[in-house]
Amino acid sequence: MSAITVVGSAFAQDAEPAASPNDRLTVLERIVIGAGTEKVAIDTPQAVSVIEQEDIDREQATMVGEVLREMPGVNTSGSDRMFGQTFNIRGIGAPEAANEEGRIIVNVDGAIKYYEQYRVGGFFSDPELYKRVDVLRGPASSTLYGSGALGGVINFTTKDARDFLEEGESGMLKLKGSYNSNRNGYLGSAILAQRFGDVADLLISGNYRESDPYVTGDGTEIQSSGFETWSGLAKLTLYDGNEGELKLSYQHWDSDAEDQDFAQTGGSLDSGSVNGFGTVDRHVVDRTAVVSYENPFSGNDWLDLKLQASFSDTTVDQTNASGIPGLLTCEGTFLAPYALFCDSEYGYQTWQLKAENTIESRGSNWENFLTLGWQFAHQTRTGEVTEAAGTTTALPYHPEGTDIKNAFYLQDEIIFNERLTIIPGVRWEWHELDPGSSTGVSQGSEDFALSPKIAVHYRINDTLALFGSYAHTERFPTLDEVYSTGGSNTVFLPSFGLKKEQSDNVEAGFALSFYDLLETGDSLQIKTTGFHNSIRDLIDANPATPGGSPFGPPTIYPLPGYINIDNAEIYGVEVEMAYDAEFWFLNAGYSHLVGRNTDTNDYLTTVAPDELALTVGGKLPEQGIKFGWKGRFVSSPQDDCRDSKTAVVCAGDSSQGSTRYAEAFNIHDVFLSWKPMDGQFRDWELHAGVDNIFDTQYKEFLHNEASRGRTFKISLSNKIGW
């Protein structure tokens, strides 16, 4: 549920979002478009962060997760490898657990993106495709986006033609090249935008990116971390002559890489190291197609319509796996775990339909925005393996099937005297699982989930606002959890009768806004959010079905492979600060999270350490120059046992330990941007920077291995308009 927000700036509660009284806007004054009616981030009754095109360009990110790393409470999990990254919000999200992907909802232009596979990440894309990322932290977003969003929601927005076409231009070509020194990373990008009068515009973009394996601060090369990818976006927007917009878009990402580490993500070190699984050739293709129509019908309080149909398809083909020569290979005697190292194909295909309308009403001292919506999603999971003898068979640890969800939701935003905002909401969602014929099981599963919320925001004056909220959501068991019948050389029963995971989240906080504080025209915003998330009936692997010996017949258990085993709590505080003046700016984000298994009192290994992110920069407006320093100050893990340079065995680990260990570290970066607004270089843009200036050796707590050492970055682009 969303938090109750405190806002310091003038909280205009009209159909128009609140705005700064100054021309300059801080990152906390950016418009939030995914939490209901549009409003600025600091006025939103939920913890929300927004990344825009300027931030993406300045970061010169290689992978999408890099643009999120300064957000409080938001991390990437898995690794810095192209095939090994997924997301973590407030301690929720870990790619080595099949159920973690469903606890965070990820959308691209509204299309659902979901992928889960053993030892592989969950999101495959390129930051060059996007102009904006909205991260809504906490389960409040379940009302609008789907039950079970225990961690939150991440919305990616792709670029549009009108982002590049200036007034009077009918067409534009933008070429961009980038280089980074760790190691020999290259990007080539081209964007073509064309306007067809007042009727339509078209954008076509293509990107090619490659890199050798990167090195860490101490000079260690991370094996098979190199990559070669290409991606593209085509988007046609049609205008009906009034306010209606029909968009048709197609996005494609492709990477065909040889000799990649089989284990792209971490977890239990069952083989002594994550590289103990050997290498494999992987071809990953991700496709997204969206058709949407939006019309605000200005002047008609009964209509503000949004319609969408989308298709998402992610496939992974694995061939030529080395396994562990002489021990575990495709030629092994038993299906599991030897099938891991046979040629195999995995995939998820998701069709979605969504309709949403907002009804406005108002009186002398109140306004009301009632949003009603319907969402339907049909997801198909595929997986098959070709054994050494050439026989094609199903995968017991990656069962095929269909997952169908049908939901209705409403959210009402009631505003009194432009000061008090109350936002109740509820979602009713029906769920059906059906096993594929290859599973040998016929029993389906049906259930119903309820996701209610209530949020309150009160603006005391132009400086101070208070907010608070309560949200409940429920996560359905996944196909993997219900129909898996095999693991690490084990055979077990399907897990019928699993209960839904349930989350109850409470948030409260305040926001401060100041203007003309140190000089005329400056602004300062501070937003602080405290939260407590209580999670019940967590689904996990049945401890009574441990992995068997890989060198003998599989161990057979007459027990379900998954059960509701744990209860947990995650609580903490997040602080965001943004200051902007004519010649300098400052942004800060701090997060302190604690997560425990309330049954055993053990620390949760998915909760990242405390972190402070700072950015201090200068501006030369007439020259179009921005420059500055960024620092990340990350503490040691909450569990002292995991404060280590190497793997250790702590509570809840296998006998070999896990990749969940790290030490405290500080990382320093510098950046420079040049975007002249006039003169002979008007259409040129330069970005340069140095990441990890001091070549520090460090490891992110939620990653497999150490991160990148010192990296010099530069990109140059030029736009040609006509």
Regions found by a protein language model. Give the residues of each.
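Flexible loop and strand-edge segments within Gram-negative outer membrane beta-barrel domains
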Residues: Q223-S225, E243-W302, T314-I324, G332-T333, ...
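Transmembrane beta-barrel wall of Gram-negative outer-membrane proteins
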Residues: Y179-E210, G219-Q260, H283-P296, S364, ...
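Extracytoplasmic beta-strand/coil segments of soluble accessory domains associated
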Residues: G65, R69-A111
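Short acidic/polar hinge/loop motifs at secondary-structure boundaries
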Residues: A111-P139
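Structural signature of Gram-negative outer-membrane beta-barrels, strongest in the C-terminal barrel
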Residues: G241, E367-F369, Q375, P399-N533
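C-terminal beta-signal and adjacent terminal beta-strands/loops
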Residues: E474-R475, S534-D537, A541, P621, ...
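Gram-negative outer-membrane beta-barrel transporters
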Residues: A15, N417, I422, T520-I535, ...
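Membrane-embedded beta-barrel scaffold of Gram-negative outer-membrane proteins
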Residues: L173, G177, I204, W302-S322, ...
